[in-house]
Regions:
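Extracytoplasmic/secretory-pathway proteins
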Residues: 1-598
Length: 598
């Protein structure tokens, strides 16, 4: 009562007079000592307060979070650790206080852990610090290292700063040093849970891809007494090492792997969710997801097997289905649509329809967001992306998805328009109908009498299924409003077409060459200019890290090049007296600006 009445001097005096003499093991002793620590803090005696809070934290689990916070509040970060450690009476107290410093640090705590082990090998906080240090290095080193490995689907979004490579190099040294230290502790016979340290040493070695050392540490850990949690961690670490050290994931290895996946799936079923900050957390569920979408999927990607890579990501989706903290419930389907070419889709379909799937394959098929229905529909779409309309028609005829597209894919407008137009309210077509019309136009383009108009209509169809086109839905399932005017680095053939309109430009040129009417040829050339404008690379924020001055400079240069279309000089010179030129001049501000500057 005196403490909460702000009678801090009374609290200190009464503790020293009465409570300090108490010799019982009652929880009241550490509770009252914490009150004295708080009173010391309130009266400006921070170092003494920090010392008492660390004593109370080590002595009892009662109000431990409160005592941890009290210690943190009492520490002046401008002072050195030794200013506080000097208050401790013995090595055990110094180890306990050092542990509290380490618990609040986001920096490398290995030096502190080494000192704690030297001072008091039996420190119970050391086990917590081991797990925490592993978690920190997973964030600083392992996560960015995994992002450098192509394939799979990382969970949520990631962000990296320009210093990540130097941070990673430094962190890799920390991981290796930590692994060696943990092995020494595990082998020391001075700790009560040596298996935890030895297994953690193995996991740290795994993070740096030192699988030989990881296997040695795992073999040592297996001989030690292990708690059930450490046994589970041993099994997971061993599984990770086994998957990654394998030269190739083949059918025999898949059969060997299946029981481990089923074991984790059973763990998920048995695990009770823990509420943490309003979220329902299930660690085993997250472990399963990460194993499939970030570990096994990447191994298949490394082998060029995008079909099984997609199925691994889809299997992870299925495990996370319905989870309130899992937004990406169709990652497998997104991967299918954004990464597989038609040859990969054919392989995936053959896999899904095989008469004699292995047990591993049957398991993947049974629990997956990627289904045969999705694959069939996308197979047709993938062939449209590659302009193979005959094969697209075959696949669309197999598909149960007959979704209507309510915009005209052959609309001929001089400006880019994504939304449905007023005169299209009753319009309806399908992907199948589009592919059939394009195939018919292909044949008509071979005849001199119909070549020019057929090439032109095909070019319209090709342009309208780009990012800028009227019916992008023919080839995509989602359209961001902030893409365009650049082709993604390492983009697929489809992405280059979708953002660059190269094939459309080629066919407008074919139409112009085949045509004889000057007004028609003017229209073809203007549409070529439209396509060429999309091929001027717009600077992207991601290309400049933090060099915004260079970004601004390149952005200005981009706009100058964007406006000075490479085809405008020819268009003005050769077709300036046509009726279409007047129409284009009235419609296109870039053309007007170009003419005015001449």
């Amino acid at each position: 009562l005196a403490h909460y009445s702000e009678r801090y001097t009374d609290v200190i005096n009464w503790y020293d007079e009465f409570a300090a003499r108490t010799t019982s093991n009652s929880v009241l002793q550490p509770l009252t000592l914490a009150l004295k620590a708080g009173a010391l803090f309130r009266t400006g005696q921070q170092k003494e307060a920090a010392y008492l809070f660390s004593k109370v934290f080590a002595a009892s689990t009662a109000k431990r979070i409160s005592n941890y916070l009290g210690f943190n509040w009492s520490v002046d970060r401008k002072a050195t650790k030794n200013d506080y450690l000097d208050k401790c009476k013995d090595d055990k107290e110094r180890a306990a206080m050092l542990a509290l410093f380490a618990l609040s640090s986001s920096d490398n705590s290995l030096p502190d852990m080494k000192e704690i082990f030297r001072l008091n090998p039996a420190s119970e906080e050391l086990e917590v610090l081991v797990v925490r240090e592993i978690n920190k290095l997973e964030e600083k080193y392992f996560t960015p290292a995994m992002l450098k490995v192509p394939g799979g689907k990382p969970f949520y979004f990631t962000w990296e700063d320009e210093s990540k490579d130097s941070v990673m190099r430094e962190s890799e040294k920390e991981v290796k040093e930590l692994s060696s230290f943990l092995d020494n502790v595990g082998q020391s016979k001075k700790v009560s849970n040596p298996g935890l340290f030895e297994n953690a040493a193995a996991y740290a070695a795994y993070m740096t891809r030192d699988y030989t050392t990881a296997k040695k540490y795992l073999a040592d850990a297996e001989k030690m007494p292990l708690t059930q949690k450490v046994k589970d961690q041993w099994a997971l670490t061993n599984l990770l090492v086994t998957i990654n050290e394998k030269d190739k994931i083949d059918a025999a290895f898949e059969e060997q792997l299946l029981p481990s996946l089923q074991w984790i799936a059973e763990k998920v079923k048995a695990e009770k969710a823990v509420t943490l900050n309003y979220w329902q957390v299930q660690q085993w569920r997250s472990i399963y997801r990460n194993l499939m979408s970030e570990i096994l999927a990447k191994r298949y990607h490394e082998q060029g097997d995008l079909a099984k890579e997609a199925l691994c990501i889809g299997n992870a989706d299925h495990m996370m289905k319905g989870q309130q903290n899992y937004y990406g419930s169709v990652n497998g389907i997104d991967f299918l649509r954004n990464n597989l070419m038609s040859k990969d889709v054919e392989k995936l379909y053959s896999l899904l329809t095989t008469n004699q799937p292995s047990k591993f394959e049957s398991y993947l098929f049974a629990y997956n967001s990627v289904t045969k229905k999705e694959v069939v529909d996308f197979a047709g779409t993938s062939y449209v992306r590659e302009y193979d309309f005959a094969k697209a028609i075959d696949w669309f005829k197999k598909s149960a998805d007959k979704k209507a597209i309510v915009k005209n894919p052959f609309i001929d407008v001089l400006y880019d328009v994504e939304e449905q137009l007023a005169d299209e309210k009753k319009f309806s077509t399908t992907k199948l109908a589009f592919a059939q019309e394009m195939l018919k136009l292909e044949q008509q383009a071979k005849l001199p009498a119909t070549a020019a108009k057929s090439f032109y209509k095909m070019a319209l169809g090709m342009y309208n299924i780009t990012y800028y086109g009227h019916t992008w839905e023919m080839v995509q399932y989602y359209r961001s409003g902030s893409d365009g005017y650049y082709v993604p680095e390492n983009g697929t053939g489809f992405q280059k077409e979708y953002y660059g309109a190269f094939k459309a430009k080629e066919y407008f040129e074919k139409a112009m060459d085949a045509g004889t009417d000057k007004n028609f040829k003017a229209r073809c050339l203007f549409m070529m200019a439209k396509c060429a404008q999309k091929q001027v690379h717009q600077p992207q924020y991601s290309e400049y890290k933090t060099n915004w001055d260079k970004y601004d400079e390149d952005q200005k240069a981009y706009w100058a090049k964007f406006k000075a279309n490479t085809y405008f000089p020819q268009f003005v010179k050769e077709y300036g007296n046509t009726a279409f030129y007047k129409e284009a001049f009235s419609s296109c501000s870039y053309l007007r600006d170009f003419v005015k500057k001449k």
